[in-house]
């Protein structure tokens, strides 16, 4: 048994069961080295539910239709590491290449832009996209919508609130900070709120990428960064096929710094570091 002296009994079999369940529900592949992480993150769930052993928790996940607990289970095991303008070369490409090309190539009749931030976490990514859009495209005449989705309802709630600690924005250029964030005072001192002009562009929705996608229409640009690192290759292939089907021809896809579509899908061609264009 693993961690016998610990607060909860957690065996090899329990760990394998957890891996199987998270893979089935969310397509996430947990590595062998994640045992301690699984134990520490899920111990809180056992404590809250008044359970003594991990096998009881696995049974609960497998047999009950408690979607709330399944959500908590997924929330506990998904990692949320994000920052404003993380992997800044993506935002430079968006500002300097992609949006100017849209302005140049789209006549007066097709000034519609649809962007999807898939796995948006606590919201820094879609708000960063929105800043670039507002700074680059003319204020009038363009119909822009950003869809921001995540599996984790807790991080989505943070994203939707749009309130962040000062630390999260202190490294942004001052002009950007002043333009897009309102400083809190009183009880909100030390915090900032995202400007309404950014919030207006974004719709936040809970979405499991493994399930059906309710959205209609196609996207010009998809950000899916540091999401598929948790998925096995067949799951990645299936996901990128679905993305391609939901994008315009020549649509652009941004993936995370350690992710690659090499031998995963034929439907995108690389344009640069972790930037792809739909080709099929």
Describe each region flagged by the PLM.
Residues 3-116, 254-256:
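Conserved AdoMet
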Residues 95, 130-134, 244:
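A structural alpha-helix within SAM-dependent methyltransferase catalytic domains
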Residues 98, 102, 133-137, 163:
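Active-site catalytic pocket residues across diverse enzymes, especially alpha/beta-hydrolases
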Residues 110-123, 145-147:
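Conserved class I S-adenosyl-L-methionine
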Residues 118, 139-223, 227-238, 260-262, ...:
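Extended basic-aromatic, gly/pro-enriched interface segments that bind polyanionic ligands
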Residues 122-139:
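Conserved SAM-binding loop of SAM-dependent methyltransferases across substrates and taxa
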Residues 237-249:
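A short glycine-rich, Lys/Arg-flanked "PGG" loop and its adjoining helix->strand segment in the class I
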Residues 258-280:
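Class I S-adenosyl-L-methionine
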């Amino acid at each position: 048994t693993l961690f016998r002296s610990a607060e909860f009994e957690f065996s090899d079999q329990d760990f394998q069961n957890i891996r199987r369940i998270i893979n089935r529900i969310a397509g996430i592949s947990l590595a062998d080295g994640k045992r301690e992480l699984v134990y520490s993150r899920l111990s809180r769930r056992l404590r809250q539910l008044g359970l003594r052993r991990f096998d009881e928790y696995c049974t609960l996940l497998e047999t009950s239709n408690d979607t709330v607990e399944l959500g908590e289970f997924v929330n506990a095991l998904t990692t949320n590491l994000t920052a404003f303008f993380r992997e800044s070369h993506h935002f430079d490409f968006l500002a300097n290449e992609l949006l100017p090309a849209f302005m140049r190539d789209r006549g007066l009749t097709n000034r519609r832009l649809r962007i999807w931030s898939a796995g948006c976490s606590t919201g820094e990514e879609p708000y960063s996209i929105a800043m670039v859009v507002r700074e680059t495209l003319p204020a009038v005449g363009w119909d822009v919508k950003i869809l921001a989705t995540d599996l984790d309802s807790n991080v989505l709630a943070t994203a939707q609130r749009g309130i962040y600690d000062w630390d999260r924005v202190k490294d942004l250029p001052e002009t950007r900070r002043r333009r897009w964030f309102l400083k809190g005072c009183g009880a909100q001192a030390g915090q900032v709120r995202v400007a309404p002009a950014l919030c207006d562009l974004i719709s936040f929705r809970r979405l499991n990428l493994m399930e059906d996608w309710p959205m209609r229409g196609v996207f010009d640009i998809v950000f899916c960064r540091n999401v598929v690192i948790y998925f096995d290759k067949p799951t990645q292939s299936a996901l990128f096929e679905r993305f391609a089907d939901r994008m315009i021809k020549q649509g652009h896809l941004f993936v995370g710094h350690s992710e690659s579509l090499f031998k995963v899908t034929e439907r995108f061609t690389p344009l640069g570091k972790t930037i792809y264009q739909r080709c099929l």
